[in-house]
Structures are given as structure tokens and as C-alpha cells.
């Protein structure tokens, strides 16, 4: 596990131990918004991962839907027809 991934895990653990008990389980999605953001940060890096996490938190409201919503997969480079 890299230093960056450990830092993300530490931040998620700190959130779950301090703020989450005060707020309660209110996320309408699976995985929860904090788990989604941690996975997005690990998969996509700090800039795109933060953007994806912020978008997810904005969708987590009574009018934003609910259910299973995993982070998008990391973009794979396109293969050219001649490489197949």
C-alpha cells in the first residue's frame, strides 16, 4: 500500500470515528459516500477522485436517487484496430 493510499485510509477512518457517529448513517447509496470517495481517490488520484466524491455527495439527497452506485472504472487506453 502506498503512502497516498494509507493517507486516504487514515482520513476515512478518522471521519468514521469522529464525524460519522454524530451525523448518523444517512447515505442513500451503496457504497456509502465516504467509501465511494476513498475508492475514487485511490483509483483516480487526488484531483479527479475529489471531483467524483464531491459530485457523489451532491447527489446524496432525497431527489438524487439511491441504490448501488460504484465509482467509475479507471479509463483504459484505447486499442487501435491494428493492435488486435
Curated annotation (Swiss-Prot):
Bias-annotated ranges (Basic residues): 75-84
Compartment(s) of residence: Cell inner membrane
GO CC terms, sorted: plasma membrane
Major place of residence: membrane
Membrane topology of this protein: Peripheral membrane protein
Annotated segments matching region Disordered: 64-84
Keywords of this entry: Cell inner membrane, Cell membrane, Membrane
Family: Belongs to the UPF0161 family.
NCBIfam families found in the cross-reference section: membrane protein insertion efficiency factor YidD
PANTHER family: MEMBRANE PROTEIN INSERTION EFFICIENCY FACTOR-RELATED (PTHR33383:SF1)
Role summary: Could be involved in insertion of integral membrane proteins into the membrane.
Name by which UniProt lists this protein: Putative membrane protein insertion efficiency factor
Taxonomic placement: Bacteria, Pseudomonadati, Pseudomonadota, Alphaproteobacteria, Caulobacterales
